[in-house]
């Protein structure tokens, strides 16, 4: 078994599992944080915006640059770099006027031929963003499996991203209408090499080292074609494919989010866990433990990015900040994804506003897919927790946002230009959480006021890199990541219950995650890095397969019970068991072993095959040896009698004998010499020590004829 890590980081999982000539791709997430390297649209920057004091020293003849000035040295040395990159407080950003957004895909270069990939298993809608790159831009022809909410909501989120990306691209074209020849030139290898030379020894040294492979986003038509190829499944539904059984179970993270069990015909069992939550108070179906119990191999990824910030604590701080901002007459902007933790927040915030006496404050949800997401959330009641399912059986919707809409406290808009008129103070949820694309960039400019707040709640984006381009903003910006995924302590508790024999984790989890079982034993832990390939030893001694129906009808089985008495197994005879042990059924089969769709099949041989089988037929011994019968057979053997051989028997201990046969050997010189054959005999084993091949064959035949079992 091999596991290839195509991921760029632990937060963008993509693994290739190779096992028994089957290749399974586990998730295909984009490294979405790469979007932070681009400047937001509709904002203008100068390289020296935040370095006026340093520029005043340019007239001095001091050539000793300090560390703060090193980050700006490329401006003086190479004006070409200044056309593509902007430096803000020592961090390089790609200018919003010279390029479209580029996206950091998994390391698909590790896969030589996508037609060899048998299937793709998707865990949730956050790990599906790279799927169109596979289905529409490679020769992939395999199967794709995901739960229905993952398919439907994932499609909405991808279409939303495409729309945001298109808006950014149009803005870049408008900003760069006089320099269209600069578009995407920053990815030129020579430009990046110059940048790396300038950044040696600095914080930005490796920032863009592999950015030459970043790609333009796919089109909406690609999403349509790609998602048509996905087969929707339900929790605990078994998929039997290529000799494997794949079963999804709830991970408790989001609508339809799943962990996967991949089992090889009852032998080795692989479990893949990504984006899981053990919380019982959230809206999704709770985490299911029993379906993923006792794995041989456990692949664990995408744990809580901020384990020191418990979700409940962050939620309390979020409400506190929202309350203080609203009481001062300010508006709260919350950049977020259009599905996920946001569904928890709508109801929680409405309840909080009522408690603090602010029920009149409206909550706005601005997204091109806002209404569709809210509709799906109500439709997929069977994918929700028990309390919300019970509401669905009543004449009520599972979520409260419909009630809030009727009260006028909650409103959904397609975008800020669709008759959106906010009544301040208010709370506005909109995308994108990176603050690089989407309506949030417009609203940040619109609400640039010290009484307003921008609260960043999504954990996927680094706070410093996110807010640096907005360093001139006077509104308050705070980072309150709400990450419901399991933290390291919960991961260790989960691992102790699952008791995996082999645990595979990203390298950054090495010091925090242990493979300690509930019984105190420790399992194997293997860490993996991007581009790594690890091999896992396969201890399986047998392989399951099928027998052709025609061949099966010709099989005549025989039974070996505990006492090894040979019995015929007929349709009218019932085989009894001894001491509650099942008897062993054995039979001789002559057939041809072949593989079809990764499944082994034994079929009847044709004429040419039959001739080959006769010549390569082997013998296999079953059962135990009858010491008494073997001794009698040796005594009655005519060859030993005719030669006058001496036969002696020594009982070493119970059921263990030494038989010594001495015979006269006449040489060419007519001198007689003794030839000794020693036979070590027990019910389970026989060793023949002799220099005479004729004697060895004779004794071997006697042993085979006196085996209390069945041999072929």
Curated annotation (Swiss-Prot):
<dbReference type="GO" id="GO:0034472">
    <property type="term" value="P:snRNA 3'-end processing"/>
</dbReference>
<feature type="compositionally biased region" description="Low complexity">
    <location>
        <begin position="47"/>
        <end position="70"/>
    </location>
</feature>
<dbReference type="Pfam" id="PF16661">
    <property type="entry name" value="Lactamase_B_6"/>
</dbReference>
<dbReference type="GO" id="GO:0005634">
    <property type="term" value="C:nucleus"/>
</dbReference>
<dbReference type="InterPro" id="IPR001279">
    <property type="entry name" value="Metallo-B-lactamas"/>
</dbReference>
<comment type="similarity">
    <text>Belongs to the metallo-beta-lactamase superfamily. RNA-metabolizing metallo-beta-lactamase-like family. INTS9 subfamily.</text>
</comment>
<feature type="region of interest" description="Disordered">
    <location>
        <begin position="47"/>
        <end position="73"/>
    </location>
</feature>
<dbReference type="InterPro" id="IPR022712">
    <property type="entry name" value="Beta_Casp"/>
</dbReference>
<keyword id="KW-0539">Nucleus</keyword>
<comment type="subunit">
    <text>Component of the Integrator complex. The core complex associates with protein phosphatase 2A subunits, to form the Integrator-PP2A (INTAC) complex.</text>
</comment>
<dbReference type="GO" id="GO:0032039">
    <property type="term" value="C:integrator complex"/>
</dbReference>
<dbReference type="InterPro" id="IPR036866">
    <property type="entry name" value="RibonucZ/Hydroxyglut_hydro"/>
</dbReference>
<comment type="function">
    <text>Component of the integrator complex, a multiprotein complex that terminates RNA polymerase II (Pol II) transcription in the promoter-proximal region of genes.</text>
</comment>
<dbReference type="GO" id="GO:0160232">
    <property type="term" value="C:INTAC complex"/>
</dbReference>
<dbReference type="Pfam" id="PF10996">
    <property type="entry name" value="Beta-Casp"/>
</dbReference>
<dbReference type="GO" id="GO:0005737">
    <property type="term" value="C:cytoplasm"/>
</dbReference>
<keyword id="KW-0963">Cytoplasm</keyword>
<dbReference type="GO" id="GO:0160240">
    <property type="term" value="P:RNA polymerase II transcription initiation surveillance"/>
</dbReference>
<dbReference type="InterPro" id="IPR027074">
    <property type="entry name" value="Integrator_9su"/>
</dbReference>
<protein>
    <recommendedName>
        <fullName>Integrator complex subunit 9 homolog</fullName>
    </recommendedName>
</protein>
